[in-house]
């Protein structure tokens, strides 16, 4: 973190896309900062969470106070598990959608990660001046590191070395069940059970846990204490020498040592255990003299093992900013450094060769890519201060057919910012929110399909379809829509095809199939027993089955080739939406594959196709090429006179 006047070197190292917003949001306070360049963290401000109705309100207040205009990228470390788009804080009343927050604040990128995952990413960069070793032990290089820290809650994480980088673990280990080690801790557990049905380590060795320990010990000694005594009061009394407060702190540190030892043996953390959070630093010498280290090593047969593992207290100021900055930098680097983002690199390479007007469109695409993707051409032209034809010329200068083609390529380069987890629709969502969630969920599912689809199976399926004597498409209920769409596409190849959505018709037709025939069975569940029996009959007669279904289903296991389309629906009881889209996409992939095969057929197939097309007065290759163009979102094939 830097202070003082900005040097020329610092100015040169500023982020090209502007300052980045960093946040560390806890149960009590929200801390914000700006990173103007790598390691240049400034304008740190702290806001009490209770004073703001929402996280968005707190961020807007910070941006206003910091007098910052546009921020493109932001990353938030939050004291809460982060699983999907919706975040509901455990130790505060804030609840928000990550994507809705990003849109409301106008960010291009908004990352939200667990605070201890962020803190973990800061550990490799800490210097000796930013940590204090507690007890003995020596850390082993390139070994697992453990992290814990009592604050409003008890955060837990870890770092695993992987080649030249570190992988941070997301964990809620603080909620592991508390296990007492002596009679005094038995008493604390019994007291806590009166209030909580499940007593986790977080209940007794997070900040509020010290109050529980203090009150449990007071009850043991039959001492009356004020109702408003909190952890800060207890720590202050302990520093002043109050016997009961000192015992509470001692007990607290011992329990913390037990938990740290558990974490060390669980992770095999030979790289050391680090202690963060806001409570322990306030204990000062009370912690250094406490039984923490002795309890850390007290693991019976593993005492020698733990004696060699060092424990450190983090003393760096605002270390979570360092970690969340590293995570954001890696995310943005992945976006711009991968093969999928070649369009960004091409824009940068071509920029100087563009006209001044086209250059303004290029700058808009680089700095605000979502604006290009989401806005109509009239808004893009207005924001870039150019004419609409200039926008089209810019796209063609990059080798794109037009604006739509450029938007598609640009979106591919932005996959790192598209949510890859499912966003739940909730009662009370506005049309903007639930509409965006439906679209995001669909896009996310398609991207995941692209990442996990077995393309060897796709090639096998295309070969089977291309050589089929007859193709029948079977789908029940909602899947019948997909079957009908497939029939509409494939009958144009000159192969006899039909689609059935009725079990009786499927059974009757399947009984007539044999070698050379193919059934494409479309099913979300892949478990309908009647459909499975129909397919068994056809396969026993020599027909082949291509299944478009979920993985590890009876249908996937029975099929000649399975094309697996796993996904998450919002509710099992409602009409399948995402699965239908994925199944339609699979049909498009298969149809394009067959069209490509038939656009350049071998001699034997060409002769067969020519005979099939003779009555239509079209050559096989021309017809297949027309269909390929149509499937590729070009013009529909012209009707033959």
Curated annotation (Swiss-Prot):
Residues binding ATP are: 23-28
Residue ranges of DNA binding: 377-396
Annotated membrane-spanning segments are: 576-596
Domain SIS, first and last residues per copy: 461-600
Question: What are the GO cellular component annotations?
Answer: cytosol; membrane
Q: Which residues form the HTH rpiR-type domain?
A: 341-417
Region span, Glucokinase: 1-340
- What's one GO MF term for it? DNA binding
Which reactions is this enzyme annotated as catalysing? Answer: D-glucose + ATP = D-glucose 6-phosphate + ADP + H(+)
Q: Where are the stretches annotated Putative HTH-type transcriptional regulator? A: 341-641
Where found in the cell?
A: Membrane
Q: What is its EC number?
A: 2.7.1.2
Topology class, membrane: Single-pass membrane protein
Keywords annotated in UniProt: ATP-binding, DNA-binding, Glycolysis, Kinase, Membrane, Multifunctional enzyme, Nucleotide-binding, Transcription, Transcription regulation, Transferase, Transmembrane, Transmembrane helix
Q: Which GO terms describe its biological process?
A: glycolytic process
Major place of residence: membrane
Q: Which family does it belong to?
A: In the N-terminal section; belongs to the bacterial glucokinase family.
Instruction: Name the HAMAP family for this protein.
Output: Glucokinase (MF_00524)
Q: Which NCBIfam families match?
A: glk (TIGR00749), PRK00292.1-3 (NF001416), PRK14101.1 (NF010701)
Q: What is this protein called?
A: Bifunctional protein glk
The encoding gene is: glk
């Amino acid at each position: 973190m830097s202070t003082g006047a900005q040097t020329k070197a610092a100015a040169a190292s500023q982020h090209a896309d502007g300052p980045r917003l960093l946040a560390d949001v806890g149960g009590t306070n929200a801390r914000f900062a700006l990173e103007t360049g790598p390691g240049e963290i400034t304008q740190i401000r702290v806001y009490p969470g209770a004073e703001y109705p929402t996280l968005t309100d707190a961020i807007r207040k910070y941006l206003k106070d910091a007098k910052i205009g546009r921020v493109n990228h932001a990353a938030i470390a939050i004291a809460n598990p982060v699983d999907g788009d919706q975040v509901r804080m455990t130790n505060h009343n804030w609840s928000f959608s990550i994507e809705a927050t990003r849109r409301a604040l106008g960010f291009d990128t908004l990352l939200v990660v667990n605070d201890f995952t962020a803190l973990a990413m800061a550990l490799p960069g800490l210097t000796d001046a930013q940590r204090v070793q507690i007890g003995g032990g020596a850390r082993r290089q390139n070994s697992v590191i453990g992290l814990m820290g009592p604050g409003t809650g008890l955060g837990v994480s870890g770092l695993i070395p992987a080649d030249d980088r570190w992988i941070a673990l997301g964990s809620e280990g603080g909620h592991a069940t508390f296990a007492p080690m002596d009679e005094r801790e038995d008493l604390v557990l019994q007291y806590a059970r009166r209030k909580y049905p499940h007593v986790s380590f977080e209940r007794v060795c997070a900040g509020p846990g010290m109050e529980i320990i203090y009150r449990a010990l007071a009850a043991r000694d039959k001492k009356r204490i004020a109702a408003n005594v909190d952890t800060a009061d207890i720590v202050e009394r302990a520093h002043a020498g109050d016997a009961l407060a000192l015992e509470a702190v001692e007990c607290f540190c011992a329990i913390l040592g037990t938990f740290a030892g558990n974490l060390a043996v669980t992770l095999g953390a030979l790289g050391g255990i680090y202690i963060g959070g806001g409570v322990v630093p306030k204990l000062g010498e009370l912690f250094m003299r406490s039984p923490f280290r002795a309890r850390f090593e007290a693991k019976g047969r593993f005492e020698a093992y733990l004696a060699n593992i060092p424990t450190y207290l983090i003393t760096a100021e605002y270390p979570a900013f360092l970690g969340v900055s590293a995570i954001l930098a890696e995310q943005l680097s992945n976006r711009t450094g991968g093969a999928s983002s070649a369009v960004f690199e091409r824009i940068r390479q071509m920029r100087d060769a563009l006209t001044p007007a086209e250059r303004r469109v290029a700058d808009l695409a680089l700095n605000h890519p979502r604006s290009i993707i989401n806005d109509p051409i009239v808004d893009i032209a207005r924001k870039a201060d150019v004419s609409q034809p200039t926008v089209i010329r810019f796209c063609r200068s990059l080798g794109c057919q037009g604006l739509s083609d450029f938007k598609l390529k640009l979106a591919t380069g932005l996959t790192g910012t598209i949510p890859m987890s499912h966003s739940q629709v909730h009662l009370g969502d506005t049309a903007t929110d639930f509409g965006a969630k439906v679209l995001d969920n669909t896009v996310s599912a398609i991207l995941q399909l692209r990442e996990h689809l077995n393309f060897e199976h796709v090639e096998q399926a295309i070969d089977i379809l291309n050589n089929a004597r007859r193709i029948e498409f079977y789908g029940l209920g909602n899947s019948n829509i997909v079957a009908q769409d497939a029939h509409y596409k494939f009958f144009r190849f000159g192969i006899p095809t039909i689609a059935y959505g009725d079990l009786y018709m499927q059974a009757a037709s399947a009984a007539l199939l044999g070698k050379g025939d193919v059934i494409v069975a479309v099913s979300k569940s892949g478990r309908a027993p009647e459909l499975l029996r129909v397919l068994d009959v056809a396969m026993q007669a020599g027909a082949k089955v291509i299944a478009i279904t979920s993985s590890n289903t009876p249908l996937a296991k029975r099929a000649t080739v399975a094309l697996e389309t796993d996904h998450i629906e919002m509710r099992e009881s409602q009409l399948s939406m995402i699965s239908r889209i994925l199944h339609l996409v699979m049909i498009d992939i298969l149809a394009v594959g067959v069209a490509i095969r038939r656009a350049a057929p071998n001699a034997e197939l060409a002769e067969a196709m020519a005979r099939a097309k003779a009555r239509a007065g079209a050559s096989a290759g021309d017809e297949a090429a027309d269909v390929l163009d149509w499937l590729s979102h070009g013009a529909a094939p012209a009707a033959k006179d």
